Amino acid sequence: MEGLLAQLCGTDAARPLPLWEGDTTGHCFTQLVLSALPHALLAVLSACHLGTPRTTNHSPALNPGWRLRLAASFLLSIFPLLDLLPVVLPPGSRPGPLWLEVLAGCVTAVAWFTHSLALWALVHSPHGRSRGPLALALAAFLPTPALVLTLLWHCQRGTFLPPLLPGPLGRVCLLILQLAAVLAYGLGWAAPGGPQEPWTHDPFLSSESQETEVAEDGESWLSRFSYAWLAPLLARGVRGELQQPRDTCRLPRRLHPAFLARVFQAHWKEGAQLWRALYRAFGCCYLALGLLKMVGTMLGFSGPLLLSLLVGFLEEGQEPLSHGLLYVLGLAGGTVISAVLQNQYGYEVRKVTLQARVAVLSTLYRKALKLGPSRPPTGEVLNLLGTDSERLLNFAGSFHEAWGLPLQLAITLYLLYQQVGMAFLAGLVLALLLVPVNKVIATRIMASNQEMLRHKDARVKLMTELLSGIRVIKFFRWEQALGDRVKACRTKELGRLRVIKYLDAACVYLWAALPVVICITIFITYVLMGHQLTATKVFTALALVRMLILPLNNFPWVINGLLESKVSLDRIQRFLDLPSYSPEAYYSPDPPAEPSTALELHEALFSWDPIGASQKTFISHLQVKKGMLVGIVGKVGCGKSSLLAAITGELHRLCGWVAVSELSKGFGLATQEPWIQCATIRDNILFGKTFDAQLYREVLEACALNDDLSILPAGDQTEVGEKGVTLSGGQRARIALARAVYQEKALYLLDDPLAAVDADVANHLLHRCILGVLSHTTRLLCTHRTEYLERADVVLLMEAGQLVRTGPPSEILPLVQAVPTAWAEKEQVATSGQSPSVCDLERTTEEELEVEQSTCGCLVQEESKSEGAVALHVYRAYWRAMGSGLAAAILVSLLLMQATRNGADWWLAHWLSQLKAGRNGSREDPASCSPGSTALFSPRLLLFSPGNLYTPLLSTPLHKAASNGTADVHFYLIVYATIAGVNSLCTLLRAVLFAAGALQAAASLHHRLLHRLLMAPVTFYDSTPSGRVLNRFSSDVACVDDSLPFLLNILLANSVGLLGLLAVLGSGLPWLLLLLPPLSFVYYSVQGYYRASFRELRRLGSLTWSPLYSHLADTLAGLPVLRAAGATYRFEEENQRLLELNQRCQFASYATMQWLDIRLQLMGAAVVSAIAGIALVQHQQGLANPGLVGLVLSYALSLTGLLSGLVSSFTQTEAMMVSVERLEEYSCDVPQEPHSQPLQSPHQQRISWLTQGSVEFQDVVLVYRPGLPNALDGVTFRVEPGEKLGIVGRTGSGKSSLFLVLFRLLEPNAGRVLLDNVDTSQLELAELRSQLAVIPQEPFLFSGTIRENLDPQGLHEDRALWQALEQCHLSEVAVAMGGLDGELGERGQNLSLGQRQLLCLARALLTDAKILCIDEATASVDQKTDQLLQQTICKRFANKTVLTIAHRLNTILNSDRVLVLQAGRVVELDSPSALRNQPHSLFQQLLQSSQQGAHSGPSGC
């Protein structure tokens, strides 16, 4: 080094870089240190700003300051080039050493030219309104002292004295001009600039506070490299201010969902391959990151190479100190640069992953909006959103590793070959033997993954259905039966997961034991070939083998990640390839031929499943004129709803054509099962349309909602809960109708909106709404209540999926074979004096109306979020779930594994020390530098020279060496191999035990969660959106199954690895222990500062997943309605808004991870440099043992990654433990039904204690919540065994509350209920409900066969099942579906709503319960079938006690007594005839009101 400096500066070799020359600084020192280095720094900082993003606004006008700085920078880049002209002058006229001036001039020119470009970029960025980054301006002024000192140096040399030479004189003039330009630059910088404008982006959250945001856009590259822009976010995390997603960072424009959706849609079209579209949209940027990966990988080899040189330097002691310093500096520099590059690579890959993630999730949701009739189950779609999308995007982290790891492997093998020659082949062969084993394992893992995902789909789908029907499940005490079905799916899922985990354990064992086995093989081979082991070769080989193991160890995971990505890609692609809803292809491009026609169908054949055996709907010809009211009638399952679905495009059109006038305006659709959003009543009615007060009032009046709103806590601002859980069936139907009416469409399709309301309300809806507000529109009305179709213009008669008759009501209605029409009923009433046979009272579910509602109308509260560190009890819960004995065994096996690994390495170091002591001073490598050498570079740095390729071959002797020192080689090898064998066994034990523990924890946590939720009261489900529960059963359970064990395994391995490393460092370099306290403090402070924010970000990320799940499930449930209303774009915007909230949390999490990583990497580089420096000092003092120092340095190289991995894995494990925390929250904190005991099998229940069937309420009081009125207020009555009791009352009177108290779905606040004089509060819930039966109004079916839905508990023979189906007139339907094993589809979608109700009635016929509760379950069947069913019920339950809530009064006229409720109190109780004959009785008033509602309407209508 000294010689090169002397040659460059033209000075004496003894003083190559003099600081002083006379009265001024040395010219060479000035040019190299004071000029070249500051200019190099200026160039680097300027280059960091070249990529500063431009503003989206027009380019701002340059103010004078920026102009002056740009001009000065450009001139300062020209002047040094002119200064190079003396190169062509004769030597005598040159102003200084030639190459010194050339080097200094080139560096200066490049620096200022780069600075000019950086200034130009900053002008067009948000910095253009200010002076720009201060650090950049300061760097521009750093070289100024060098200019002044150079000018003084020329003055000292007499440049201005004769004779005046052109070279020196011109250079002085240029120096003066440069000083003037620097002064101009300073004036330009000092000129005032405007305030800096904030970086603009595509805003979605317009209401967010700009003061709390941080953003990456507009930041300098220095800030980006150091992640300094995250400081405000981290500070908020420490202060505990990260409470909601809006508290996180603002998204960069390139990560904003709206921007990414536009970018991706430009490359995506229907039917395209997803991976091609992703590649076109983001592939170029992603592939470019491969260059960064390659450079970082190459620099990663600087550690082992420089370790080899440094250990050789310490061992031989013949090189100059400058070489040792150079090795230490190279080790530090290479580690730092590699860390920065690898960190930036990881950060940019994560950003690309986020971009692709938004594109995939947006595309999945957009496809969900376009799904045709053959759509997959909701649970499967939710799995695509959560599990499969995440697995697919793991490809981004695996692809570059897939080629980077083989490259790293090849370089490592070459370097290993340089160290040990052909002996490396023994280890290579051993490693290659595992490749086919790995292939077999990977294939099995892929196959098991596919099966596991199928079982997971089934489990999530079943959970979705279970949550939707939880009330019916509790009525029928099916918690055990359906819980067992979920457990069966979970068992199958865990069976596949068990295969995956044990195969993973085999991989872990093979690759964890491989380093020691390879080292043994190589060293034994090397010794047997006659070579002598040295510290240099051994520890360099150890470091290289560790680097060799990294790609070999990671390669199975990389391949596994790629395979999982492929599986998930195929699943997503199959979903995207499903037929889409396409109005352009479905409807005729031309409107109906006649302008007066609103709708026309001709020779049209429709089907729910084009390739299945589902019933077809055929319409030979149908023409509907504008403004007509068309009634549609027919038996249950005849195809009425299918006809409306065919008109809206929800069926497959197999042939014919459909023409709709004004198709672009959409339809007003009110479905048979009302779809209600989890929002306020007003929001449900507006449905995204602008609020019009006049229209809104008209709609409320027309839909008879004013009275309902008057009794709700917050009027139309009352939240209705998920799926309208707080509303009655009639209220849901009217709100759905009001939503359709408010949209002001030209064509309305109304699917039996009158079925769930009483006669008064039905009459009101008919005259005020259907014949009133909608009188100017075209209306198609399906109904079983034919008395309301007498005002229709045309009536359509459907039978077996075909339109068989069309005509006026007078012709069609008599053919329906219904109960006598209204005119006939009038005559019957007049002659017999009896009440009308068709009278309706609306059923109101009071507990749903009032449960969990506060005075502000808020029902669903925001999801709770824990704060601070994950509590210790969460870790204890996971420990208990894993099993205390198993968990302790895992820790012991880990400690033994690390102890034996350290023991093997220590024994190797001890062996080498003995070899060195026994050697006679000879060296195996003759190529060494003499002690007096002053060469700058060691020749051994040329590791990749062509000659080195042959050196190991030439140094391999053809015969075995006579001796390998005085040590007993065989003894040391045997001991080393024994320790390695024990290490291998401990590694195997650890892998197997951990796999078993992870499986045990996964099974236990899911079982506890499921059992707790099955035992939760219905009030919990009323106030908890199903998305929250499904999020736990999907994402959180998936995390516990896979991500958490993976990260916990890494954390434990890193922890024991750090203990072993510290032990080695302490034994080899005791002075290093002095650094541990401050180092530990720094690491603890950094990770504590980081964890405070990261864990909250992970929690927020989990919270923002739930709304995405709920929104998708809600969209799938209401797809026909929102498509008919043309609201798909608004729902897509809402999905983007929710996705942005989640994206913000994900981006902030990734950025904080990289913030931590770069700091840990740099601190680790500093520690490695300190260790190398201490080793160098000990060597100078003669205290270094090359064997121990080599061992310490080989371990120290892994210190950076180990410490970084430890903190990162601990933080990520803590983040994954948030999933355990969320599962434990529901497993421990969810309220439970009283006296909930472990569920018994139905075969193990006790002998029935209910023998008679009497029911008695004694002063029962029920309050849903403090501050709300009593739902039941001192109710007292008795029902005798076998008595038939009808229950009537107006809305909110407390009818349904009686059933809830009877079944103990709600506990009374006072009073008691007796069954056969037994207090129900003293009975177990399962025992109580086993003696009761219920027929609910809303049918609940789940995926499975007819047999499973009829008899989930498997208590009845097939003969009994067929008999029940026959009595309910469903036997023909069952035969057509394939018998009792016919599949019903998700939620019974293969049946019509009326058929579903009949199937639920068949369940009740199978029961042996003494008490039957009927909540009018025949509203959706035709009247003839209704009559037959009533006869069946009377016959089947003739000797049973029957309680019937009257929805239609004809169902209770034959009751023994009628109970009349008002405001939660019993006001009347007597026989129907007695109450009817009592003057001014409430029952008589209800009858009169019903009679008027059925037969008359407001005048003028």
From Swiss-Prot:
UniProt: ATP 1 binding residues: 634-641
Gene Ontology molecular function, alphabetical: ABC-type glutathione S-conjugate transporter activity; ABC-type transporter activity; ABC-type xenobiotic transporter activity; ATP binding; ATP hydrolysis activity
Modified residues (Phosphothreonine): 464
Main location per the UniProt record: membrane
Residues the record lists as Phosphoserine modifications: 468
GO biological process, one term: leukotriene metabolic process
Enzyme Commission number: 7.6.2.2, 7.6.2.3
Catalytic activity: ATP + H2O + xenobioticSide 1 = ADP + phosphate + xenobioticSide 2; an S-substituted glutathione(in) + ATP + H2O = an S-substituted glutathione(out) + ADP + phosphate + H(+); 17beta-estradiol 17-O-(beta-D-glucuronate)(in) + ATP + H2O = 17beta-estradiol 17-O-(beta-D-glucuronate)(out) + ADP + phosphate + H(+); leukotriene C4(in) + ATP + H2O = leukotriene C4(out) + ADP + phosphate + H(+)
Single GO cellular component term: basolateral plasma membrane
Membrane-topology descriptor: Multi-pass membrane protein
SMART domains (alphabetical): AAA
Domain ABC transporter: 599-825, 1255-1488
Name by which UniProt lists this protein: ATP-binding cassette sub-family C member 10
Taxonomic classification: Eukaryota, Metazoa, Chordata, Craniata, Vertebrata
Name of the gene encoding the protein in the UniProt record: Abcc10
